[in-house]
């Protein structure tokens, strides 16, 4: 809300408006003077969006009569929490149940901590006062690709250095390959399969050295370096030792009910196992609340979608093709390209495809992976279909409005069912 999902999407949208005005308005018959970037206003709007959302949450807390204490919370014992405010004042809270939901923070390189000036995390990258001339991004995952895209659109030279041989490695391999193609068209430079060996701040220049698998080295110089190699649970100040909880690789161990080893203490979100996603944390929060109310809730972790808010967007749910191969499961693939989609042509957003994985015997949809315009919204169709164990044929036989991006899902399901998409 403050330094993650919402501010990054605000900047992604603003930067997309900017590049469209600069490069695509003329094709739509809109003649305007050359647009000029006002980064100060862009950052200001982002902050206003964040404030609006924060104020909305504060209103909901008040409406539901939830008391809020601002400060650093830590355990005194399993039924006592101490909150230390910024002015050093301490407040003691007595409680029957505790839910730990403290989130995560960016992980630095072991040999180069964040200086928050030139070697920055996503937090500082959302608050830059100047447009980088050359932004070097370490890490080709979701955060690196999203923020790298923002500054590439605004005119920065952007270079991505990734240790693995593919982008967004946790998603289906086809998505990473397609994202590489489209972001190269944006002008982003990539060094895949490179391990960063040194990173130094030399005043107004950062110098990075990286080594490929064949031991050849490269040296890159930029004015900012965004380190986006992952995040780690934020548990440092909780005083977990006071209640006998030990972390494992930084995470708080929980059982299938999200309960810790201490019977009245639960943990959710980024501090526990699983993907570090806001909507996963939300599902877990609802799960624990309903459980404490005596209900019998359920979270299907396989069907928690993942999204990359580049443009085109990338969205995924269910199994990847790589996972199905590893399981030895027989499957079939249905794919449909955006360039064959009337709605995509009308919007001039023809990069991308929909990929559906279905069981070879039963036709049940096992995974859906989309790269293209509106993918973040479209993936809900995959979640719904898989939640009710629909087959590819089930979706293919449903009427989809024309012209829409969702028709690509229908066509991909037709391709998976009997290799008979209508428009390719």
What is each PLM-predicted segment?
Residues 144-145:
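N-terminal Rossmann-fold NAD(P) dinucleotide-binding loop
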Residues 6, 10-17, 309-320, 325-424:
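Flexible, glycine-rich terminal cap/loop adjacent to redox cofactors
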Residues 138-141, 270:
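Glycine-rich Rossmann-fold phosphate-binding loop(s) that bind the pyrophosphate
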Residues 115-132, 219-293, 381, 396:
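FAD-site-proximal beta/loop scaffold in flavoenzymes
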Residues 70, 212, 255-257, 359-360:
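Short, acidic, Ser/Thr-enriched surface-loop or helix-capping motifs
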């Amino acid at each position: 809300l403050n330094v993650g999902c919402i501010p990054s999407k605000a900047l992604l949208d603003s930067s997309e408006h900017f590049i469209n005005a600069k490069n695509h308005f003329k094709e739509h018959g809109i003649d305007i003077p050359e647009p000029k970037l006002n980064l100060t206003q862009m950052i200001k709007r982002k902050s206003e969006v964040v404030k609006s959302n924060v104020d909305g949450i504060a209103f909901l807390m008040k409406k539901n009569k939830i008391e809020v204490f601002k400060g650093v919370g830590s355990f005194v014992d399993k039924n006592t929490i101490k909150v230390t405010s910024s002015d050093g004042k301490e407040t003691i809270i007595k409680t029957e149940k505790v839910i730990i939901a403290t989130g995560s923070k960016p992980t630095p390189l072991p040999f180069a901590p964040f200086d928050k000036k030139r070697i920055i995390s996503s937090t500082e990258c959302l608050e830059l006062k100047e447009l980088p001339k050359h932004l070097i991004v370490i890490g080709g995952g979701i955060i690196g690709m999203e923020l790298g895209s923002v500054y590439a659109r605004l005119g920065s030279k952007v270079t991505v250095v990734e240790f693995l041989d593919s982008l967004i490695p946790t998603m289906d391999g086809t998505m990473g390959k397609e994202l590489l193609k489209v972001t190269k068209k944006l002008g982003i430079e990539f060094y895949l399969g490179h391990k960063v060996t040194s990173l130094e701040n030399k005043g107004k220049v950062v110098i990075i050295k990286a080594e490929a698998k064949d031991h050849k080295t490269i040296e890159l110089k930029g004015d900012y370096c965004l380190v986006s190699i992952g995040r780690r649970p934020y548990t440092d100040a909780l005083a977990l030792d006071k209640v006998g909880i030990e972390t494992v690789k930084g995470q708080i161990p929980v059982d299938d009910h999200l309960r810790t080893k201490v019977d009245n203490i639960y943990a959710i979100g980024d501090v526990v196992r699983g993907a570090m996603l806001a909507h996963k944390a939300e599902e877990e929060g609802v799960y624990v609340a309903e459980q404490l109310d005596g209900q019998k809730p359920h979270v299907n972790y396989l069907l928690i979608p993942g999204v990359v808010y580049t443009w085109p967007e990338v969205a995924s749910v269910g199994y990847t093709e790589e996972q199905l191969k590893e399981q030895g499961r027989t499957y079939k693939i249905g794919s449909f390209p955006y360039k064959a989609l009337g709605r995509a042509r009308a919007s001039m957003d023809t990069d991308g495809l929909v990929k559906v994985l279905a069981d070879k015997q039963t036709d049940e949809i096992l995974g859906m992976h989309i790269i293209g315009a509106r993918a973040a919204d479209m993936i809900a169709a995959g979640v719904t279909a898989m939640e009710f164990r629909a087959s590819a044929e089930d979706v293919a036989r449903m009427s989809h409005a024309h012209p829409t991006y969702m028709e690509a899902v229908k066509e991909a399901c037709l391709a998976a069912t009997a290799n008979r998409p209508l428009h390719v």
